[in-house]
């Protein structure tokens, strides 16, 4: 059985940076926590907890020590509280996420209504909205929602960093019919685009696709959706234990990709498991 492993599988720059900062901070500070999970990988979060980094869900529950700002960023209101309490900050926000925050803020300051392409309940999206400080922001997940947008004199478009370029492009096309003036900032992470394009190519060749990563990871879920559109025999797994032998009946070529927050050791376990089945 042939195995095609995506070159782009695993940690992206932002996740690698965030985890390195977190492990270094664990050595530096006696009392340290992260506001929400640093990345969307339960396995990595568990390893960080073993190093003494507790995940705290509410900023109000942090009254001393150091706090790590997760890779997805936090809200402006949460950051205000952290500053007010004079907590030490380890900022692990992905630079691409910060760029999306800055563009959304700039657009609102210049009088644009912002169309944010993304998932309304995702922490990254909630963070981006908050930095506009009450500006008009419409969160749209797909073309259907974009069709319902009201007309506005000026529209500015930004995207959650893990969105597909195709989705951004289609929504932008609809927005062109909603306003006389439209500004578009492609805030999709470069690594996301590379990963998605590579997944498409592999899915065209493979008889079965395995997409490895946290079930709570937006970019991994999107990878699975992209692969599923091309290769219906696509399975999203978080760990090697979830792989079932019955999936591989009649399969000659297996494609494997992984989300941006999937550690290498989990990918290696999946590759080893599939290799063992072909012996």
UniProtKB/Swiss-Prot annotation:
Q: Which residues form a coiled coil?
A: none
Entry's InterPro entries?
LytB/IspH
Q: Which reactions are catalysed by this chain? A: isopentenyl diphosphate + 2 oxidized [2Fe-2S]-[ferredoxin] + H2O = (2E)-4-hydroxy-3-methylbut-2-enyl diphosphate + 2 reduced [2Fe-2S]-[ferredoxin] + 2 H(+); dimethylallyl diphosphate + 2 oxidized [2Fe-2S]-[ferredoxin] + H2O = (2E)-4-hydroxy-3-methylbut-2-enyl diphosphate + 2 reduced [2Fe-2S]-[ferredoxin] + 2 H(+)
Q: In which pathway does it act?
A: Isoprenoid biosynthesis; dimethylallyl diphosphate biosynthesis; dimethylallyl diphosphate from (2E)-4-hydroxy-3-methylbutenyl diphosphate: step 1/1; Isoprenoid biosynthesis; isopentenyl diphosphate biosynthesis via DXP pathway; isopentenyl diphosphate from 1-deoxy-D-xylulose 5-phosphate: step 6/6
The UniProt annotation places (2E)-4-hydroxy-3-methylbut-2-enyl diphosphate binding at: 40, 72, 122, 161, 217, 219, 261
Q: Which residues are catalytic?
A: 124 (proton donor)
Residues annotated to bind dimethylallyl diphosphate? 40, 72, 122, 217, 219, 261
Chain positions recorded as isopentenyl diphosphate binding sites: 40, 72, 122, 217, 219, 261
Which residues constitute the signal peptide according to the record? none
Binding positions for [4Fe-4S] cluster per the UniProt entry: 12, 94, 189
Tell me where on the tree of life, at the top rank, the source sits. Bacteria
Q: Which GO terms describe its molecular function?
A: 4 iron, 4 sulfur cluster binding; 4-hydroxy-3-methylbut-2-enyl diphosphate reductase activity; metal ion binding
Pfam families of this UniProt entry? Answer: LYTB (PF02401)
Q: Which cofactor does it need?
A: [4Fe-4S] cluster
EC numbers listed for it are: 1.17.7.4
Q: How is the cofactor bound?
A: Binds 1 [4Fe-4S] cluster per subunit.
Question: Which keywords accompany this UniProt record?
Answer: 4Fe-4S, Iron, Iron-sulfur, Isoprene biosynthesis, Metal-binding, Oxidoreductase
The UniProt entry, under Gene3D superfamilies, shows:
3.40.50.11270, 4-hydroxy-3-methylbut-2-enyl diphosphate reductase, catalytic domain
Q: Please name the GO terms of the biological process aspect recorded for this protein, alphabetically.
A: dimethylallyl diphosphate biosynthetic process; isopentenyl diphosphate biosynthetic process, methylerythritol 4-phosphate pathway; terpenoid biosynthetic process
Q: Does the keyword Ribonucleoprotein apply?
A: no
The record's comment on protein family reads: Belongs to the IspH family.
The UniProt entry, under PANTHER family, shows: 4-HYDROXY-3-METHYLBUT-2-ENYL DIPHOSPHATE REDUCTASE (PTHR30426:SF0)
Role, per record: Catalyzes the conversion of 1-hydroxy-2-methyl-2-(E)-butenyl 4-diphosphate (HMBPP) into a mixture of isopentenyl diphosphate (IPP) and dimethylallyl diphosphate (DMAPP). Acts in the terminal step of the DOXP/MEP pathway for isoprenoid precursor biosynthesis.
What is this protein called in UniProt? Answer: 4-hydroxy-3-methylbut-2-enyl diphosphate reductase
Say which species the protein is native to.
Syntrophotalea carbinolica (strain DSM 2380 / NBRC 103641 / GraBd1)
């Amino acid at each position: 059985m042939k195995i095609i492993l995506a070159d782009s599988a695993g940690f992206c720059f932002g996740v690698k940076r965030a985890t390195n900062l977190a492990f270094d901070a664990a050595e530096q500070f006696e009392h340290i926590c992260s506001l929400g999970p640093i990345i969307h990988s339960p396995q990595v979060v568990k390893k960080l907890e073993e190093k003494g980094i507790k995940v705290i869900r509410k900023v109000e529950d942090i009254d001393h020590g150091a706090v790590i700002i997760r890779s997805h960023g936090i809200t402006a209101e949460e950051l205000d509280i952290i500053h007010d309490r004079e907590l030490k900050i380890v900022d692990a926000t992905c630079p691409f996420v910060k760029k999306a925050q800055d563009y959304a803020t700039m657009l609102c300051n210049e009088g644009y209504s912002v169309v944010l392409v993304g998932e309304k309940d995702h922490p990254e999206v909630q963070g981006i909205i908050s930095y506009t400080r009450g500006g008009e922001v419409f969160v749209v997940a797909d073309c259907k929602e974009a069709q319902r947008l009201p007309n506005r004199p000026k529209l500015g478009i930004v995207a959650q960093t893990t969105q597909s370029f195709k989705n951004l492009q289609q929504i932008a096309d609809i927005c062109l019919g909603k306003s006389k003036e439209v500004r578009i900032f492609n805030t999709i992470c470069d690594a996301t685009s590379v990963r998605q394009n590579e997944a498409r190519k592999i899915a065209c060749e493979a008889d079965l696709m395995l997409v490895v990563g946290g079930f709570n990871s937006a970019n991994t879920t999107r990878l699975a959706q992209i692969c599923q559109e091309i290769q219906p025999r696509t399975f999203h797994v978080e760990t090697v234990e979830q792989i079932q032998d019955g999936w591989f009946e009649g399969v000659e070529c297996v494609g494997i990709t992984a989300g941006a927050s999937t550690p290498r050791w989990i990918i290696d376990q999946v590759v080893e498991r599939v290799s063992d089945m072909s012996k």
